[in-house]
Every structure is written in structure tokens, then in C-alpha cells.
Amino acid sequence: MAKRLLPALKYTPHTYFIKAVLASTGETVGLAGWTGPGNPCIHNIFRRSAIDYYGWKEKMGWTDAEIDEMWSHVSDENWSVQFGKDDDTRKEIFGDEPHWYLAPLLTWPEYQSRGVGKRLLNWAIDQADKTEPLTPMYLESAPTARAVYMHVGFVPQGAYNFVRRGPAVVRGLEAEEGNDAQREKLEEVSVEAMAEEMEAHPAI
């Protein structure tokens, strides 16, 4: 996957991959991919068609055989068809309105429910809430994560589409996540850009 995403980091200036790092050990415990509001178009970088859409084949010097190999183990339904439908939904919601887009957000299993995901969310939320007017945000969520996003102000727009327009707590499903005070919290976790690391180690 890293090889497929490398051109997004090299040639798409408004794409950010960040990681959560445990301060005591330097261990990576989660990561997030954000597309910033400066991006002029809506076309998910995970779609195979992004190669042609963004001109990555020429920029990376890839052959057709290399591209076929990179996508040989990938479900077209999950990675192209569904992401295409999601892009259409996002266009319907925002049109040309600048916004932040989250995909993906991952926390290593042993560190889930310990605040890592919120740190990765806050990296962009803090920036979105500093603008005037506030910059909206968008994501698609698995059913098991809906409450996490609602707790920081994301409002459902369908089965798994969410929009956030400023600070709020959307009452309802977030209660299923339990009391934050009862969760085991991590020691200090920092959030860092990981573009340089992925470029240096494309097999990651």
C-alpha cells in the first residue's frame, strides 16, 4: 500500500499522513490520513483511478505492469467502486466548499479505547476550528466507531457518512463508548507527520 500512496505524499501537497507515537519508546500506535481544505478536487487517493486523475504514472515513472502488480491483490469493489460512491456523496454535501477529509484512521488493537484516535482527530480538528468561518470536516465511519466521531461533533449524514461543522457533542450513540474517565489512558503520545518516513521506507 505504501508504494501506491507514495505519490500522494510526494505530489499532492494537501495530503497528510500522521502517526501517533508513544513518547517513552518511540513506538507507533496509530495513524491517520487527512486531505486538507486546500485540495481543489474530490477524488479519493485510494482509488486506482487516482493514478490517472492526478498524473502519478508519469510522475513516478510507473509501467502498466507495475501498476497491475500494485493492485493485483486489491478488491476493485472495495477500493474503487465504493470509494467512487463515497466521493459522489461528498460532492453532493460540499460541492466546491473547502473541507478536511479523513481516511483512514487506525489505532493498533492493543491501544484502542485509550485516547490515541482522539489525538489523531485533534490534529486536524484544532486547525479546522481556528479558521473563520470554521472549516467543515468529513469522514466515513464503520458502525463500531460512530460514537467516537459523534463525541467530537461529527453529525451522521447517512449510514456511515459524517460531517462536522465546529465544536459540539452529538448526543446519542457516543454514550455507548462509556465514560471517558473510566478508560485507561496512555502516557504521553505525540502526533507526527510520517511523509518522510514512508518515502524513505516505501515497503512499510
Which residue stretches match the model-derived regions?
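Conserved GNAT acetyl-CoA-binding A-motif
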Residues: 98-102, 127-141
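Conserved acetyl-CoA-binding loop-helix of GNAT-fold acetyltransferases
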Residues: 104-107, 113-126
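Conserved beta-strand-loop-alpha-helix junction that forms the acyl-donor binding cleft
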Residues: 105-112, 137-148, 162-169
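Conserved acetyl-CoA-binding loop of GNAT-fold acetyltransferases
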Residues: 150-159
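Conserved acyl-donor/pantetheine-binding loop and adjacent beta-alpha core of acyl/acetyltransferases
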Residues: 27-106, 112, 167-204
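Active-site rim helix/loop that mediates acceptor-substrate recognition in acyltransferases
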Residues: 1-17, 21-25
